[in-house]
Amino acid sequence: MRMWRIESLRVGLIDTRYRLLRVESVSLGSMNESIAHPREIFRPAITYSAYAVIVVHNHPSGDASPSQTDHSLTRRLAEAAELLQIKLLDHIVIGAPSDTSPGYFSFKEAGVL
């Protein structure tokens, strides 16, 4: 995903044993944004009876730092996940690795989730 020229948001569907059931493409955006609504992100989880989800999207710029929009989306996803009783395990932003960055940002690792 880090080499793609447009933002793409995907959701990994996880079963009760924390095994990956499938990966669904939810949104394709422009060069600098991917518009996604929680209902579109959780629709595949409901359809396939997923226990949990991992949300992943890329930043074509290569900078994996989350934007304000990314933070806002993560908060809304956490609220929706709680309401739907589907675990949101992580929201990961993919960029390009560098000397100062591993090339990704994990909201879970950062303590946001």
Model-assigned labels for residue ranges:
Residues 1-21:
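Long amphipathic N-terminal alpha/beta scaffold segment
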